[in-house]
């Protein structure tokens, strides 16, 4: 066990600044209106830094810097851009522990996750797109003996990126790595709940990028996010967050006919067929671990498997074991490497989760375990902690249909394959799903039948850089990750060239 010291205390490997301004044009600049807001740690509910409160004036200044930098960055050779991304990855790897502690303190998640997943994945995403852009090629089409169609990949120019609070550094990386690799300049707005860890990351890597290529404007959605998303000066808007906000982002961008990538909410089903229980072996144990994935990152994941569907013939035995497995999840100090579940990211999110715990009870759902806030004493007093909770009910309940974004799973049974698929698809969302079975025919058929952008099969919560990610239905538009993302941040230029000296013959 390792217990990291809180940032800024004796023995700490991380120190946050007392104040962070906007990062514009390669330097920190104060907010145009001189306003700041406090940023509390979910670990104890206490402010640890203050953040510049951005407005439209700050957004315009950032766009000025981005537009000045974009042409030069777009003309920079692919080799040089790739090398810079690799240097960013190397710098992050050299400071992995510091980044992990910084993010855990600001977001509340267990440091075991940031050490093993969040930061290593972010590093790998930069390396992946550094390689992908080197391998990308245009195309040539021979129309006839004298006519050739050339196709070139050109950057969009200046793009807007709005980042969520559940994975501050990783979600920024998902957007930044392909955008920068493709030759774009970026204006990024972090979530108002978690802006500081982005600035800590910037303190490590900002010197590697030309001034103006990456600009960060802090602030709240209406004050900074709206003017950024609605600006005619951006060529694309990429957003990750809840569906209601995504709908607004789409409206803002549509006013200027700008493309959007939206990674939105989910209510992902995790389906356990009865053959999972056929033998008491490693696979059964793996499936039980798969059930508990609803508590990963405190359930603050868009693809959280927040609905579990268990085949009726094994339901009682499976759920007895699943409840026991869930109760082994260890809460505690987020900076302790033994802690398995930390704090919710904000007090607002804590209150939302607690309200859904009440809703579930009012609907008649049965609490199989959990269902309460965790009240810690000592240095965790005032933090935002919730017990992993299992509800038993039916798919028409609000707790089955609405995104809670907390460590809460709603469980029901199904009769057969068709019943499982019908229940899985009975939702407005379609971001992720899980299928657990020993029969690969069942696995394949279920994966194709479920209306979701990603279907994990005998696994869950894996996010490799080279696997496309995105939603069906109201879970979003577009994809993230995979080399296809380069083209999402590019436009295709066609030069149709005739080498014939003869006349066209029209007139």
From Swiss-Prot:
Domain of life of the source: Bacteria
A GO term, aspect molecular function: aldehyde dehydrogenase (NAD+) activity
The keyword Zinc is annotated on this UniProt entry: no
Keywords for the protein's UniProt record, in alphabetical order: NAD, Oxidoreductase
Database matches in InterPro entries: Ald_DH/histidinol_DH, Ald_DH_C, Ald_DH_CS_CYS, Ald_DH_CS_GLU, Ald_DH_N, Aldehyde_DH_dom
Stored PROSITE patterns: ALDEHYDE_DEHYDR_CYS, ALDEHYDE_DEHYDR_GLU
Residues forming the catalytic site: 263, 302
Enzymatic reactions: an aldehyde + NAD(+) + H2O = a carboxylate + NADH + 2 H(+)
Record EC number: 1.2.1.3
Entry binding sites for NAD(+): 219-225
Family label: Belongs to the aldehyde dehydrogenase family.
Name the record gives this protein: Probable aldehyde dehydrogenase
């Amino acid at each position: 066990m390792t217990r990291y010291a809180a940032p800024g205390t004796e023995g700490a490997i991380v120190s946050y600044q007392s104040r962070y301004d906007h990062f514009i044009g390669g330097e920190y600049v104060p907010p145009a209106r001189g306003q700041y807001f406090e940023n509390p740690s979910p670990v104890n509910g206490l402010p640890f830094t203050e953040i510049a409160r951005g407005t439209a004036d700050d957004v315009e200044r950032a766009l000025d810097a981005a537009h000045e930098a974009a042409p030069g960055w777009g003309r920079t050779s692919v080799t040089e851009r790739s090398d810079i991304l690799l240097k960013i990855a190397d710098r992050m790897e050299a400071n992995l522990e510091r980044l992990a502690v910084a993010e855990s303190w600001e977001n509340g998640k267990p440091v075991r996750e940031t050490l093993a997943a969040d930061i290593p994945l972010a590093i790998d995403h930069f390396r992946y797109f550094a390689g992908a852009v080197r391998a990308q090629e245009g195309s040539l089409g021979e129309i006839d003996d004298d006519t050739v169609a050339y196709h070139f990949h050109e950057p969009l120019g200046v793009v807007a990126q709005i980042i969520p609070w559940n994975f501050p550094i990783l979600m920024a990386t998902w957007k930044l790595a392909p955008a920068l690799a493709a030759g774009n300049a970026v204006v990024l707005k972090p979530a108002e709940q978690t802006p500081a860890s982005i600035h800590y990351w910037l303190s490590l890597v900002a010197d590697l990028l030309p001034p103006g290529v990456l600009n960060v404007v802090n602030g709240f959605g209406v004050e900074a996010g709206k003017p950024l998303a609605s600006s005619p000066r951006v060529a694309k808007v990429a957003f990750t967050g809840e569906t209601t906000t995504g709908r607004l982002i789409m409206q803002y961008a549509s006013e200027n006919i700008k493309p959007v990538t939206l990674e939105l909410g989910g209510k992902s089903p995790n389906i356990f067929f009865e053959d999972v229980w056929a033998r008491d072996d490693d696979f059964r144990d793996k499936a039980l671990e798969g059930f508990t994935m609803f508590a990963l990152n405190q359930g603050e994941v868009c693809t959280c498997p927040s609905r579990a569907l268990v085949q009726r013939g094994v339901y009682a035995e499976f759920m007895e074991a699943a409840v026991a497995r869930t109760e082994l999840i260890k809460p505690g100090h987020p900076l302790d490497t033994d802690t398995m579940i930390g704090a919710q990211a904000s007090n607002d999110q804590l209150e939302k989760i607690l309200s859904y715990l009440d809703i579930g009870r009012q609907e008649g759902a049965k609490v199989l375990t959990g269902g309460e806030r965790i009240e810690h004493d000592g240095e965790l007093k005032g933090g935002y902690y919730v017990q992993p909770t299992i509800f038993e009910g039916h798919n028409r309940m609000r707790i089955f249909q609405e995104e809670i974004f907390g460590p809460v799973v709603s469980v029901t049974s199904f009769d057969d394959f068709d019943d499982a698929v019908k229940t899985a698809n009975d939702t407005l969302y379609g971001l992720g799903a899980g299928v657990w079975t020993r029969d690969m025919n069942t696995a394949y058929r279920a994966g194709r039948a479920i209306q979701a952008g990603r279907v994990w099969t005998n696994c869950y919560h894996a996010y490799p850089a080279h696997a496309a990610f995105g939603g069906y239905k109201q879970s979003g538009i577009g994809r993230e990750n995979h080399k296809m993302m380069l083209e999402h941040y590019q436009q295709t230029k066609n030069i149709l060239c005739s080498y014939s000296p003869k006349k066209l013959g029209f007139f």
